[in-house]
A protein has these predicted regions:
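Alpha-helical transmembrane segments and their helix-helix packing motifs
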Residues: 2-267
Length: 268
C-alpha cells in the first residue's frame, strides 16, 4: 500500500514568470533604458515609431474595406494594428508608451527622475521621426491609392476623428490606452518564448484599438498621414478634416502623451 504522506507529487513548472519576477525584470529593463547612449536610444526609438506606423498602415488599409459591420471591423482592425507592438517587443525597439513603466525603476530608486525624463524625451522624439519617415515612404509608394483610393479616404477619416474630440476626452482616452499597453508589455515580459509574448499582447492591444483609445505614437503616424492625404485632396467630405494641420496634430499629441504618461505612474 502506498503511503500518500511519503509520496512526492511533482507539479509542472509555470510557463510564465510570476508577478514579482515580472516587476524585477521591468526594473532591470528600466535601468537599462535609462543608461542607453542617446544616439542608440534615438535609433531604437525611430525603429519603434516605424514599427507602430506599420501597424497603423495595416489598420487603415483594412478599414478601407467597409463590407464588415462596425464592431467586427474594429476588432479585426485592432488585431491588424498588433503588428506594430509585436515588432517592437520582439525586435527590442524603444517605445515611448511602453517606457512609462520606467517608473518601476524610479520607485525603487535605481534611476533618477532626470534620467527617466531624459530617456522619455529622446524616445518620444525618436518615435515621431520614425513615424514620419514611414509617412514619407507610404506616400512615395502610393499605398494610399489602393482599393480605388479608398485607403486614402480611410487615412483621412481615422485622423479627422482624432482631432475633432476635446482635449480632456483625448487625455482620458490616453490613460485608458496605456492601461492596455502597460498590461500588454507586462504580459509580454512574463512570456518565456516568442509565441508566449506575441499571443499575450494580442488581446490588450486589439482591445484598445477597437475601443478608439489614444496612443500618442500611433497618432504620430495617423495624424500626419491623414494631413498629407487631405492636402492631396482626399477626404474633402470627411467631417473635421480641415483640422488636420500642425495645430490639430499638436492639440491631439499633447493630450494623448500626457494621458499615456499618467497611467505609467499610476500603474506603480
Amino acid at each position: 500500500m502506498i503511503d500518500i504522506a511519503d509520496s512526492k507529487v511533482e507539479y509542472p513548472a509555470p510557463d510564465c514568470l510570476a508577478p514579482a519576477a515580472i516587476e524585477a525584470k521591468t526594473e532591470v529593463a528600466g535601468v537599462t533604458k535609462a543608461n542607453l547612449p542617446v544616439a542608440k536610444a534615438f535609433l531604437l526609438a525611430m525603429f519603434a515609431g516605424a514599427f507602430i506606423a506599420f501597424g497603423g498602415l495595416f489598420f487603415t488599409v483594412f478599414l478601407s474595406d467597409s463590407t464588415l459591420g462596425w464592431g467586427a471591423q474594429r476588432v479585426v482592425g485592432g488585431l491588424c494594428f498588433c503588428l506594430g507592438l509585436v515588432l517592437v517587443l520582439v525586435c527590442g525597439a524603444e517605445l515611448f508608451t511602453g517606457n512609462s513603466l520606467m517608473v518601476c525603476a524610479l520607485k525603487s530608486k535605481k534611476i533618477t527622475l532626470v534620467q527617466m525624463l531624459k530617456a522619455w524625451v529622446v524616445v518620444w522624439v525618436g518615435n515621431f521621426v520614425g513615424a514620419l519617415f514611414i509617412v514619407f515612404l507610404v506616400y512615395m509608394a502610393g499605398i494610399y491609392k489602393l482599393n480605388g483610393e479608398a485607403v486614402a479616404n480611410s487615412m483621412v477619416s481615422v485622423a479627422a476623428g482624432k482631432v475633432t474630440v476635446d482635449w480632456v476626452t483625448i487625455f482620458f482616452r490616453g490613460i485608458l490606452c496605456n492601461i492596455f499597453v502597460c498590461l500588454a508589455v507586462w504580459i509580454g515580459t512574463a512570456g518565456k518564448t516568442v509565441v508566449d509574448k506575441v499571443v499575450g499582447i494580442l488581446l490588450p492591444i486589439a482591445a484598445f484599438v477597437a475601443c478608439g483609445f489614444e496612443h500618442c505614437v500611433a497618432n504620430m503616424y495617423f495624424l500626419p498621414m491623414g494631413a498629407v492625404m487631405h492636402a492631396c485632396g482626399y477626404g474633402a467630405d470627411v467631417a473635421g478634416a480641415d483640422a488636420l494641420n500642425a495645430a490639430g496634430i499638436a492639440f491631439n499629441l499633447s493630450a494623448a502623451t500626457l494621458g499615456n504618461i499618467e497611467i505609467g505612474r499610476a500603474h506603480v
